[in-house]
Amino acid sequence: MRSKVKEQWICCKLSMPLVLLLCMACFLAGFYVSTTLVTQSMLPQNGIGGAGGRRSLELFEEEDQIIFEHGETGDDDISEMRYQILSWHPRALLFPNFASKEKCEAIIKLARSRLAPSSLALRKGETVENTKDTRTSSGTFLTSKQDKTGSLRWVEQKMARATMVPASHGEAFNVLRYEIGQKYNSHYDFFNPAEYGPQKSQRMASFLLYLSDVEDGGETMFPFEGFRNMNGKYDYKQCIGLRVKPRQGDALLFYSMYPNGTFDKTSLHGSCPVIKGEKWVATKWIRDHDSW
């Protein structure tokens, strides 16, 4: 009698691994079935897609592009613009591949024959002679009406969409060329009334479209980014802080004013010397009023 009980106990002992395997198999099967059912229940039942009701990513994206009712001044299409926030102090954003190579080269071609040494808005006590080393580029001012290719007009319209500021608030494009060794020392685009006198309007933001690649140097720099180097000892000729490397077709937007309309001191910026190659850039200053 004792031997039979022992024999049964041995059989039960030997079958335990099998029982565990069966339990695990049942659990996994149940998990798979429940997951499949939940996934299928989340898919729209509209018959779109291949076998099993699966739908491609393209179909999802296409269906998401719903055109909403818009006002008289709105658009009847959906705009998509990629951007990267480079800084919050100052507020600076980079728009990669903002314009095509063809548009950039068309703008360069239009500007090349009109270039002249770049000038400065002088503050009290400054003269052309004592500021001649501050900005050594050459440039010209162009409006979209002067461009028969339509490239500047296209940039202007897309820029208005990116900034949500009407194109009428923008000054003429300042197209600049920097050759080897040429640069623009750190400065503000904002006109401080204490230095420049009363202003009808202010440059609230600056929009830069890089028209060419630069092999080395030529970065747009923000030495006070993140409130750094603001101890009063900064040399305005130094190329330090946040530096944005020019790349053809990319655009840079930064604000010289806070949303409350006050001056942002961290918006100090400049153009590092070009070490190798040539730098072309189209700058448009955006005003807080459409008259200045």
What positions do the PLM features span?
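Fe(II)/2-oxoglutarate oxygenase catalytic core
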Residues: 1-292
